[in-house]
């Protein structure tokens, strides 16, 4: 297209020289230059893909992802288009997590943030300088739609810690328009918390406890050299209020802790690692492969990845969390019975193993070790030869027997030895 615009401009130059009044030509040239600029600003977008294909061609954006299914890692990767994921906080971690899920072909993304893109955000990933001044949600939708038009994107520019924002947040999570057949009170499959303050985390925690919604929490330290992710299942694992940070437990307003002129450090590397761990565990949770980490830390100074499990606190200050704990304990006998039945079913299932190789070119057979020993013993004890074969020399036993008979010292020598021993014993006793 750029070549065509350049040729058109060249033609206008030639035409300008042949006309006495070049004003009209200059006007046309201005229009062409504007069109050329617009064509550069609006890159080509691919068409939507109706069905995922594993065909390995350059034009298939999902061929590398579908290879996970072909290699046995995932049973059915196409299910990813049925899932909805909500991301709260489109900052250094949340924006990268949103991009990763978009490239993986997630079905629907719900994006929540109230901040705008600034030049100070350019040290991080995802956002571009030409998006400065836009809300982070609008900028994210713009970029993600260009990356993968198959993903349904819904943005909410609001603060979820306000009363109105919290109500909008919970109502959007319960919207099942994307998947009406989804069970439970929530319309999303997973909530990812990528916020940078405890107040917003507590708001997400409250909403997920009320809706019985599984969610994952993530964060990066103020010095930008460590981070963590955590899986939170209401009633089964500790919620964010079960073991709150000191700032939350003491009731201090965290806004008073921020010093004027001092900002937290930010490294795109640390945020990229945390976002990768977050999305990796999200995919394992959604597509049911591997093991989801209940808590995974990251210390970049020592490349240390601590893991742990956090049980719910029976004395948690969150009322909704206590209710979920009671529900989980009441359902425990049913879960144990189901697990026992599954274990028995797996144990009773016998797999008929066929031959490792159908063809046996060299007629190799497997012989039992015990039978092989018996066969060897029987063969060694038998002195019979096949018909038509004779021994040139006698066997060792026959040879020794013949020498003993010839010398006449067979049994006589043994008797003499016994007599000598008897006399020696009598002499010892007499002494």
UniProtKB/Swiss-Prot annotation:
Listed Pfam families: ThiF
Sequence segments annotated as region (Disordered): 339-396
ATP-binding recorded as keyword: yes
Keyword DNA damage among record annotations: no
Binding locations of ATP: 92, 113, 136, 159, 197
Domain of life: Eukaryota
Active site: 263 (glycyl thioester intermediate)
InterPro entries documented for this protein: D-isomer_DH_CS1 (IPR029752), ThiF/MoeB/HesA (IPR045886), ThiF_NAD_FAD-bd (IPR000594), Ubiquitin-activating_enz (IPR035985)
Annotated CDD domains: ThiF_MoeB_HesA_family
Entry keyword set: ATP-binding, Metal-binding, Nucleotide-binding, Ubl conjugation pathway, Zinc
Signal peptide coordinates: none
Biological role stated in the UniProt entry: E1-like enzyme which activates UFM1.
PANTHER family: UBIQUITIN-ACTIVATING ENZYME E1, UBIQUITIN-LIKE MODIFIER-ACTIVATING ENZYME 5
Annotated protein name in UniProt: Ubiquitin-like modifier-activating enzyme 5
The species this protein was found in: Arabidopsis thaliana (Mouse-ear cress)
């Amino acid at each position: 297209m750029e070549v065509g615009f350049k040729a058109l401009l060249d033609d206008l130059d030639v035409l300008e020289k042949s006309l006495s009044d070049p004003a009209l030509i200059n006007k046309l040239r201005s229009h062409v230059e504007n069109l050329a600029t617009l064509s550069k600003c609006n890159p080509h977008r691919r068409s939507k893909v109706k069905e995922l294909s594993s065909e390995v061609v350059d034009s298939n954006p999902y061929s590398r992802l579908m290879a996970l299914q072909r290699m046995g890692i995932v049973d059915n990767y196409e299910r990813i288009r049925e899932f909805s994921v909500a991301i709260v906080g489109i900052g250094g971690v949340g924006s990268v997590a949103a991009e990763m899920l978009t490239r993986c072909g997630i079905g629907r993304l719900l994006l929540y943030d109230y901040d705008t893109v600034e030049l100070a955000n350019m040290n991080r990933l995802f956002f571009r300088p030409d998006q400065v001044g836009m809300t982070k949600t609008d900028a994210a939708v713009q970029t993600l739609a260009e990356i993968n038009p198959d993903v349904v994107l819904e943005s909410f520019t609001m603060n979820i810690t306000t009363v109105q924002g919290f109500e909008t947040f919970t109502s959007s999570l319960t919207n099942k328009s994307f998947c009406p057949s989804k069970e439970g009170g929530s319309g999303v499959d997973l909530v990812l918390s990528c916020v940078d303050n405890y107040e917003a985390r507590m708001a997400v925690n409250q909403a997920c406890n009320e809706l019985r919604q599984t969610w994952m929490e993530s964060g990066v330290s103020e010095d930008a050299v460590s981070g963590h992710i955590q899986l939170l299942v209401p009633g089964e694992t500790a919620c964010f209020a079960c073991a709150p940070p000191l700032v939350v437990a003491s009731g201090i307003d965290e806004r008073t802790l921020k010093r004027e002129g001092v900002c937290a450090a930010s490294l795109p590397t640390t945020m990229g690692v945390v976002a990768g761990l977050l999305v990796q565990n999200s995919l394992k949770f959604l597509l049911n492969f591997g093991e989801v980490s209940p808590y995974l830390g990251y210390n970049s100074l020592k490349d240390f990845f601590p893991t742990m499990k956090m049980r719910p606190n029976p004395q948690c200050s969150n009322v909704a969390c206590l209710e979920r704990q009671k529900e989980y304990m009441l359902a425990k006998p049913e879960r144990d019975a189901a697990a026992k039945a599954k274990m028995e079913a797996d144990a009773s299932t016998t797999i008929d193993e066929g031959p490792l190789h159908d063809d046996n070119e060299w007629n190799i057979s497997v012989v039992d070790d015990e039978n092989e020993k018996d066969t060897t013993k029987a063969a060694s004890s038998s002195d019979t030869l096949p018909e038509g074969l004779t021994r040139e020399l006698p066997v060792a036993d026959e040879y020794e027997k013949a020498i003993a008979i010839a010398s006449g010292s067979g049994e006589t020598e043994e008797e003499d030895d016994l007599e000598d021993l008897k006399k020696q014993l009598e002499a010892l006793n007499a002494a």
